Amino acid sequence: MRYLVTAALFALLLLPGRSSGVERSRYFLRLQDTLLRAQDSLVAKTADSLAVNDTVPALDSAAQAALADSLRRQHVYDSLDHIFWTQIDTTTLPCFDSLSVAWADSIAQFLPDTHDIKRLVRKMRKEERDSLKAAKPRVMETWVLPDSMYFRRILVWTSDKKFNEPTLGGLDTTANSNYNEYPMYKKDVGASYLGPVGSATQYFNYFKREEVPDAPMFTPYIGDSYTDENIPQYNTKTPYTELAYWGTPFANKKSEESNLKLISTQNITPSFNFTLGYQRLGSRGMLTNEDTDHRTTMIIGNYMGKRYFANFGTIRQRIVRNENGGVQDAFWIRDTSVEAKSIEVNLTSASNTYKRRQWFIHQTLAVPMNFFRKDRDSLALGEGTMAHLGHSGEFTTYSKVYADAIGTDDTFGRAFYHNQFYLDQTTSSDELMVRNFENRFFIKLQPFAPDAILAKINAGIGYQILATYSFQPLDYLTGRRYDTQHNLYVYGGASGQLKKYLAWDADADYYYAGYKMFDFDINGKLRLSVYPFDGGIHLTGKVHTGLQTPHPFEQQLYMNHHQWKNDFSKVSKSTLEAELSIPKWRLDAAFGYALVTNMLYYDTLAVIRQHDAPVNVMSVSLHKDFTLWRLHFDNRVLLQLSSAPEVLPLPKAAVNLRWYFDLDVVKDVMNVQIGVNAVANTRWYAPAFSPDIGQFHLQTSEKYGNIPYCDIFANVQWKRASIFLKYTNAFYDSWDRPQYFSAYHYIKPVSGIKFGIHWPFYTW
């Protein structure tokens, strides 16, 4: 500090206008010498001046005093003044002007003070900091990821709400990934759905069916949207944008399908990312009165710092759908070639509006516990003994509004609901609402290292406020009333790994107070990996067991077409799953077994029931891509068995075969796949759908299956853009009795041309 102040003072003394007293004296002497030389050039009158001898005699003190007095006399000053001013002419004026300018420009006006010195010191310090900041690269530093991943151009992950643990994923923008325009076909071999894209869906594979425990009416729609636990989070070095469109732009406006997806993500700093997303799935449908508009909007962000890691955002899901209840008679689909729009449907004036709004945050603060280490400053981020303090918060609102108008002379409409009209004989307006406010606080201890065999020990506590609303007759007197449940629970877990060969984790929840008292959930996972070749062989095992209290809507409901009041027991569910993955061979296999006691289901009248006997489910699936020269045989097969098909019907077999010829039109520029895609399943009692409660339910009237649904396609990878062109349901007229039903009395899209493009934009 002393040397810095000295340097600043020295710099101030050298600056123009900041000269020292010594320097100022030097300037004054130069000016005086110049003035004297200018005055010596003036001619003095002899009479007014003293005669000066060539030799000056020595004077005594009296003579010196007399001389001094003579010089001080007024007439001497007046004489010199007269001489000076009378001798100024145009040649001497520029001399005075230049001298005055030089003096004003070069002579210090004032000396530097303490404030000047401090100001210069601050300036020098700022310049030093700016130079260091400019020289330092902007690199993400975090304990969440190993330093080998800091320099990846883009990172994608999801985080769980229990412990805010990130699960890294990939970003696949290839033509193979974007070929399936229906989200359900990306996750499963097949599914039951209501025809248009974005409508209610139920997967064939029992082990891939998703649920919304807090709002059961959203279960058929959650697979086409995002939640706080499966929404992708990004960290990218340069801005990244995805634009996608797929649909039937050449179809009739009455049955047009139009889908859109937009994602734009950018890092504001190396640690902070901001993402905007929008997705629209929808179609006017093949039948009358089945317009579907399914939209999801996302505003999310994340911060991945040295000690702080957070994922946060808001998700808005909205579905507006006209409900037709399916065709009145399947004869018009199987045995005729009548235009689909002219076929009569069960409901002519019915609709559903679903809304879900979710705000969430998952955050963790890392605290290194190395207080007694002398070299703790050199300790790598995330290494050694650490504690992680975390919080997970969520506020979600769900709503469903169903409305219909069924006249007294509408035979098919009234028969569709089995002539059940409890509140009004002609119109319905039923509303279901749920509000979920939940907070979790947890601590994660890292005893040794993030890659140790015992890497983390976790514990937490949670509090949930669940408010539900459904109409009750008492509301006529009291108005709308929410039924509120409070739930308190504790949870914990542990995880670890052994290099890259073994990884394990386990967690458990237990509700000790509230509506869900004595509910529990236990999960375990073990992954073994060996590497005899590139990509390795990976075997994963999962185990789950739990006890769950039925939702308030499952216990009691009062609507115009359905009502019940139950006292169901807790549902017990245990599963065992195994997965095998060999990337080099493009092979994936899975096995699943489930045992469910007190299973809930909806009977043929769409009334909820509880099965009093255990139900066993077994499933085997295989995905293998065979290659023969340029021919690809991409096959997915699913086999399933249910011990109680009268309660849980499942297709015994389902396949998805995509066979194509792969051709490089221009190497590393354009690749084209030309082939056929077929989906099929064995005959089974496909479920029916009840629009007012928003649930799939049993039907035993008719079986569907054994007829493949085929698309002829051209799939193109043109640099970054992936483009497909399909002729859907190409063999619609090739079968004697086509049964292209997606669910009971709901049909799949008929023949038509579909076009899609997916284009990512980025620079790296």
Specify the residue positions occupied by each region the protein language model found:
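Generic early N-terminus positional signal peaking at residue ~5-7
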Residues: V5-T6, R26, S619, D634
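Exposed, low-structure sequence patches enriched in small/polar residues
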Residues: T236-T238, L243, S349-T411, F416-W764
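Short periplasmic/luminal acceptor-recognition loop of GT-C membrane glycosyltransferases, typified by
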Residues: R2, V22, L650
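Hydrophobic h-region of N-terminal signal peptides that target proteins for export
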Residues: L9-G17
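Positively charged n-region of N-terminal signal peptides that target proteins for export
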Residues: M1-L4, L276
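Membrane-proximal, glycine/serine-rich, low-complexity loop/turn segments characteristic
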Residues: G21-R357, A366-G382, R527, Y531, ...
